[in-house]
């Protein structure tokens, strides 16, 4: 069952509050971010795992490279093990407990729209870059979703847009190859991420877009 135009569906995770709304068009501006809900040729939903967690990236942006880290403990569960080790190395006092060795920062593939690009050209470029040129697009879906995400950890709001993207590659074509992209460390099936905090709303996004092809 889908949502009608402008109807809003809300999801909440320990970190995020996400509003999902179906819209007619994606606005074109320098701040527009577009993402693809990618479906493989054999029907699997794809998701990317970032090389760096958003929490660690935010900490780095606020710190001098030689400084002692000041880190809220509520951020620790949203970081990679190697990032936690780096924080522990710089701790003046305290310790890090309850590390989740299986944490991954899941994201939809896509990025920021260039002013000279169409929406679909932007997605083709981003998918090519983030997959080390392994992903090629067969066709795009017709439904557009607006995602409004409030990051409760940093009290910031992000707006992005998403559409389905059916690709020519199978899951096996993509899952057994290394990726050297600066942002993405791995591309995998969303079906393998059922224990992730983001799984529920990411699954909803895929179901909305795919079933409305």
From Swiss-Prot:
N(7)-methyl-GTP binds at residues 16, 50, 151. The lineage of its organism: Viruses, Varidnaviria, Bamfordvirae, Nucleocytoviricota, Pokkesviricetes. Keywords: Hydrolase, Magnesium, Manganese, Metal-binding. Decapping enzyme that remove the protective 5'-cap from both host and viral mRNAs to commit transcripts for decay by the cellular exonuclease XRN1. Accelerates viral and cellular mRNA turnover to eliminate competing host mRNAs and allow stage-specific synthesis of viral proteins. Acceleration of the turnover of cellular transcripts may even promote the shutoff of host protein synthesis. Its cofactor is Mg(2+); Mn(2+). One of its GO terms (molecular function) is hydrolase activity. The keyword Transferase does not apply. The active site is at 126 (nucleophile). Induction: Expressed in the early phase of the viral replicative cycle. It catalyses: a 5'-end (N(7)-methyl 5'-triphosphoguanosine)-guanosine in mRNA + H2O = a 5'-end phospho-guanosine in mRNA + N(7)-methyl-GDP + 2 H(+). Pfam families: NUDIX (PF00293). This is mRNA-decapping protein OPG121. Transmembrane segments: none annotated. Its EC number is 3.1.3.-. Mg(2+) binds at residues 117, 126, 130, 151, 183. InterPro entries: NUDIX_hydrolase-like_dom_sf, NUDIX_hydrolase_dom, Viral_VD9. Residues 30-209 form the Nudix hydrolase domain. Belongs to the Nudix hydrolase family. A motif (Nudix box) lies at residues 111-132.
């Amino acid at each position: 069952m889908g949502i009608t135009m402008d109807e809003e569906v809300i999801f909440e995770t320990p970190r995020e509050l996400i509003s999902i709304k179906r819209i007619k068009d994606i606005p074109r501006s320098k701040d527009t971010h577009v993402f693809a809900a990618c479906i493989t040729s054999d029907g699997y939903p794809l998701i990317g795992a970032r090389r760096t967690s958003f929490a660690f990236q935010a900490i780095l942006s606020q710190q001098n490279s030689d400084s002692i880290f000041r880190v809220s403990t509520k951020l620790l569960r949203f970081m990679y093990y190697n990032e936690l080790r780096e924080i522990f190395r710089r701790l003046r006092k305290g310790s890090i407990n309850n590390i989740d060795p299986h944490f991954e920062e899941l994201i939809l593939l896509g990025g920021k729209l260039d002013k000279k690009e169409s929406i679909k050209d932007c997605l083709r470029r981003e998918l090519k870059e983030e997959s080390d040129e392994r992903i090629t697009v067969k066709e795009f879906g017709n439904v557009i979703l607006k995602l409004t995400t409030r990051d409760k950890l940093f009290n910031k709001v992000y707006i992005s847009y998403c559409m389905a993207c059916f690709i020519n590659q199978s899951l096996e074509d993509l899952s057994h190859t290394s990726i050297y992209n600066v942002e993405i460390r791995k591309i995998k099936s969303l079906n393998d991420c059922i224990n992730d905090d983001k799984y529920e709303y990411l699954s909803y996004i895929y179901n909305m877009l795919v079933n409305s092809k």
